[in-house]
Structures are given as structure tokens and as C-alpha cells.
Swiss-Prot record:
Biased composition range(s): Polar residues: 439-459
Membrane topology: Peripheral membrane protein
Gene name, Swiss-Prot/TrEMBL: BAIAP2L2
Domain of life the protein comes from: Eukaryota
Gly residues composition-biased segments: 321-331
One Gene Ontology CC term in the entry: nucleoplasm
Source organism phylogeny: Eukaryota, Metazoa, Chordata, Craniata, Vertebrata
Originating organism: Bos taurus (Bovine)
Biased composition (Low complexity): 301-317, 473-484
Function: Phosphoinositides-binding protein that induces the formation of planar or gently curved membrane structures. Binds to phosphoinositides, including to phosphatidylinositol 4,5-bisphosphate (PtdIns(4,5)P2) headgroups. There seems to be no clear preference for a specific phosphoinositide.
Disordered as annotated region, ranges: 221-332, 399-529
Protein name, as recorded: BAR/IMD domain-containing adapter protein 2-like 2
């Protein structure tokens, strides 16, 4: 046998062996995996159906509410759309099962028998032809050896058998290669059909979702507007945390009205006896004071301002933006340093330099405040750096440099020096000139010792209240109350008409000057490496 024919034979047998031992087992495994994929998809489809039915029920509940009807409609539409897409996907899976898996499973069983028969037939035919050719060649060799006259005809017959054998092995190899290619083409064409079905499904899904998703997004963003929120919930931001018991934080209007003396400094409140019963001397002294002292304007205490300014809004657990909403007692006023325009954003607040804005949020959100322009109904966001806090303390018309603090008209007269502590004077003898009382030297010395140590104005609220002063004996209080009531009232009235001078003689006018830190930028500094 010629070596080339033997090579064709081995190549053809390798193709049949590859189809039987590699391709068909791989196709059987692919059918098994495809069936697992179908079972997983059916389980996924059932779970998706249950999930989107639950979403639809929640949307129907939102439709019955008074605040979330738009959101409920969005949820119902989303559920219907997803279930419709799920049904379309089931069509794709049916195509995958009917046009791919079933054909592969059926063709695999038939193909295994067909390839076995083809290989057996080729092997038998090849052996038969090879045997005939071998027999003819042996006869030709004997006839040539005997010099037979029929040797010429036998040689032609051997050449013909050899050509037929060569054509047979070539045709058999091409047939085997074609069968191998046909099987790979079958697998590729079936999955191409599946890919085309997926492409059609995703095209329909894109056309269905593209416009609806944009509409749902616009409606969802529109529901974030504070004007649409009828009650504090998911869409309405709440300013200030609730109390641990669940009730809302009371505002300044809901708080009980306090006495006028409670708006003074902590030291003056201790001295005026705000933690105990009011002595009879204090009541008599308050009756002797003029009417304009009783009708002093009531200013909010620094402690209430501090507590209201330290409120916190609730956490953004649902991605809510901080909205505007005026709290009862947490609003503060600021003055604009520069002008601010809203531009194309209608949520910003427009104001000019010098305008007063009422801040409606307890603290800045990323450097932005939300407030309302005083004297108008416009409100919006504005940068925190554009404004500065507005001093709400009243100014003494006789001396604009010294603010007037609230005084309790019902406080004892023997504690008059404590009322005057809101005036940050530079020396102690100026106050002694105003109220030179022989019986109150201890209180005044204690006060000026504390003033020299603190060097801070008394109208600034203190975090920790100072300890109460040691009460005077009852006999001393009664004597002081009976002897010095009228004189103290006269001195206080004359002091209000003619306030003390800003820098009395003998004091240091630069004692409270604070120097601003400077930076040395000269080149004489050493170069450190």
C-alpha cells in the first residue's frame, strides 16, 4: 500500500473518532447544561413574578394615600412593565428550548449511530479495496516473472484499481471533513438564531423602557419638592430631632414665659434669687422703681438661642435633600455682605448687600443655608460665606458702645452691682464711683476679682453656670434693704441718665485690644532642609 493512501486513511479515521469521542459527548453535556439553565430560568421567572406582584401591591397602597399617589402610580407602572418584559423573555426561552436543546438532543442520538455506521463502512470498503489491489499486484508480479503474455493486461488492471483506491480515500476524507463541519455549523446556526431572538427582545425592551424611565424619573424628582409634601414623611424633611419619647421639639412660642431676670447673666440670676422665694425687700424695691424700668423690652436668652441653633435635622436615610421649613424657635437672622442672584436655578435666594435674611435651617448643608428674605415671601438657598450673623442685642441709646442687658425689676436692691456687670469697664473704681455703698464691699470685690480673671463681657452665655454666692445673713439683708432702698434707686436713675465714660481716668484703654497674629515672610529666616 502506498504511503499517501495510508495517510489519507489515518486522517479520515481520526475525523470519525473526533466526532464520536469529542463532539457528540460535548453536545450531550451541552444539552444537560441547557436543561439546567431552563430550570433555573423558570425558577427565576416565578420569583420575579412574585416580586413584581408585591411591588404592585405596595403601589396600590400608595395610590390610596394622600401624599404618595404619584409614587404609587410609578410603582404600578414599573411592575406592569417588568412583568411584560418577563413574559417576552419567556418566549425567548421557549425558542431556546424548542429550536436548540431539543434538536441538539435528538441529533446527538442519531448522529452517534450514523457516525459509527459511516466509519465502519469506510473501514470495510477501504480494506476490501486494499485487498483487491494487493492481490492484483501480486498476480502481476508472478506474471511478469513467468513472462506471461497477459501481464500487460494485468498491469493495466492494477493501475485502474490503484486509481480507484486513491479516489476512494480522497472522497472518503472529504466526506468525513464535511460531516465534521456540518455538525459545528449546526451548533453555530442554532445559537445564532437564539442570539437573534435575544436581540429582538432587548430591542423591544429598550423601546419600552427608554421613554418610561425618563418620565418616571421626572415624576419622582417632582415628588421631592417641599410644596408637595402634606405631612412630614419620606418626602418632607424634618428640622430638629424628635424627643426620645416621640413628641416634637417645642418652639419658643410653646415654652412657658420666663421671668425677665432669667435673661440676664448666670451670675446675676444667682444674685437675684431666681432659685428661691422672693424676699419682701425685693418686692418693695420693685414697686418703687419707675414704670419704664418694668416695661423693658424682653429679649431672648442666650441659652435659648444656643439650644435652638444646635438642633440637627434627621438623617438622610432615604436620600432626601434638606428642605426649607421655618422652625418655631430655631430661626436666626443674618445680614448679606454681598449681593446674590439666583441665575437659572429657581431654588436659590436672591438678595442685595445689606438685606436681612431669616435662616430656616439649623446648620449649613455643604456651605449652603436655606432662608427667607425679610420683608418678602421669597425663600431659597444661598452661600453661608455671603452673610454674617446679625447682632440682635439692643443698643443703649445713651451709649451705643455698651449694649443693654435685660434686668429683673424684682431682684433685691442689695444686688444692684450685679445688674451693671454687662458694662465691660476697664477699672473697678469707676463702678465704685457710681454705686459707693459701704455695706456691699464684699460683693463688689468678689465681682471685680472675677472680672479681672475672665475679661469677658457678661452678655455672652456661659456653658457652666457659676456657683451661687454665699447668702448674706438675714439681719444684714434687712438692714440694707431698709436703709438704702431710696438712695440706690436715685443713684441708678441718675446713672441711666448719665452713663459712665468709656475710658475713666486712670484706666488702660488698650487693655482689651486683641492683636491679630502676623506672619513673617522676609527672607532673613533660615533655610531648613
Amino acid at each position: 500500500m502506498a504511503p499517501e493512501m495510508d495517510q489519507f486513511y489515518r486522517s479520515t479515521m481520526a475525523i470519525y473518532k473526533s466526532i464520536l469521542e469529542q463532539f457528540n459527548p460535548a453536545l450531550e453535556n451541552l444539552v444537560y447544561l441547557g436543561n439546567n439553565y431552563l430550570r433555573a430560568f423558570h425558577a427565576l421567572s416565578e420569583a420575579a413574578e412574585v416580586y413584581f406582584n408585591a411591588i404592585q401591591k405596595i403601589g396600590e397602597q400608595a395610590l390610596q394615600s394622600s401624599t404618595s399617589q404619584i409614587l404609587g402610580e410609578i410603582l404600578v407602572q414599573m411592575s406592569d412593565t417588568q412583568r411584560h418584559l418577563n413574559s417576552d423573555l419567556e418566549v425567548v426561552v421557549q425558542t431556546f428550548h424548542g429550536d436548540l436543546l431539543q434538536h441538539m438532543e435528538k441529533n446527538t442520538k442519531l448522529d452517534m449511530q450514523f457516525i459509527k455506521d459511516s466509519r465502519q463502512h469506510y473501514e470495510m470498503e477501504y480494506r476490501h479495496r486494499a485487498a483487491n489491489l494487493e492481490k492484483s499486484m501480486s498476480q502481476l508480479w508472478r506474471m511478469e516473472r513467468k513472462r506471461d503474455k497477459n501481464a500487460r493486461e494485468m498491469k493495466e488492471s492494477v493501475n485502474r484499481l490503484h486509481a480507484q483506491m486513491q479516489a476512494f480515500v480522497s472522497e472518503s476524507q472529504r466526506a468525513a471533513e464535511l460531516e465534521e463541519k456540518r455538525r459545528y455549523r449546526f451548533l453555530a446556526e442554532k445559537h445564532l438564531l437564539l442570539s437573534n431572538t435575544f436581540l429582538q427582545f432587548f430591542g423591544r425592551a429598550r423601546g419600552m423602557l427608554q421613554n418610561r424611565v425618563l418620565l418616571w424619573k421626572e415624576q419622582s424628582e417632582a415628588s421631592r419638592s417641599p410644596s408637595r409634601a402634606h405631612s412630614p414623611g419620606l418626602l418632607g424633611p424634618v428640622l430638629g430631632p424628635p424627643y426620645p419619647s416621640g413628641r416634637l421639639t417645642p418652639t419658643r412660642l410653646d415654652m412657658p414665659q420666663r421671668a425677665l431676670g432669667e435673661f440676664g447673666s448666670p451670675r446675676s440670676r444667682h444674685g437675684s434669687g431666681s432659685y428661691g422665694p422672693e424676699p419682701a425687700e425685693a418686692r418693695s424695691a420693685s414697686q418703687l422703681e419707675p414704670d419704664h424700668r418694668r416695661s423693658l423690652p424682653r429679649t431672648p436668652s442666650a441659652s435659648s438661642l444656643y439650644s435652638s441653633s444646635t438642633q440637627r435635622s434627621r438623617s438622610n436615610s432615604f436620600g432626601e435633600r434638606p428642605g426649607g421649613g421655618g422652625g418655631g424657635g430655631g430661626a436666626r437672622r443674618v445680614r448679606a455682605l454681598v449681593s446674590h442672584s439666583e441665575g437659572a436655578n429657581h431654588t436659590l435666594l436672591r438678595f442685595s448687600a445689606g438685606d436681612v435674611v431669616e435662616v430656616l435651617v439649623p446648620e449649613a448643608q455643604n456651605g449652603w443655608l436655606y432662608g427667607k428674605l425679610e420683608g418678602s415671601s421669597s425663600s431659597g438657598w444661598f452661600p453661608e460665606a455671603y452673610v454674617k450673623p446679625l447682632d440682635e442685642l439692643p443698643v443703649n441709646p445713651m451709649n451705643p458702645l455698651n449694649p443693654v442687658t435685660s434686668m429683673n425689676p424684682r431682684s433685691p436692691v442689695n444686688e444692684l452691682p450685679s445688674r451693671l456687670r454687662s458694662y465691660p469697664l476697664r477699672g473697678s473704681h469707676s463702678l465704685d464711683d457710681l454705686l459707693d455703698r459701704p455695706g456691699n464691699s464684699t460683693a463688689s470685690s468678689d465681682y471685680w476679682d472675677g472680672q479681672s480673671r475672665s475679661r469677658t463681657p457678661s452678655h455672652i452665655p456661659s456653658r457652666t453656670p457659676s456657683p451661687a454666692p454665699t447668702p448674706l445673713p438675714s439681719s444684714r439683708r434687712s438692714s440694707m434693704g431698709s436703709m438704702g432702698v431710696a438712695s440706690d434707686v436715685k443713684k441708678l436713675a441718675s446713672w441711666e441718665q448719665q452713663p459712665p465714660e468709656l475710658f475713666p481716668r486712670g484706666t488702660n484703654p488698650f487693655a482689651t485690644v486683641k492683636l491679630r497674629p502676623t506672619v513673617t515672610n522676609d527672607r532673613s529666616a533660615p533655610l531648613i532642609r
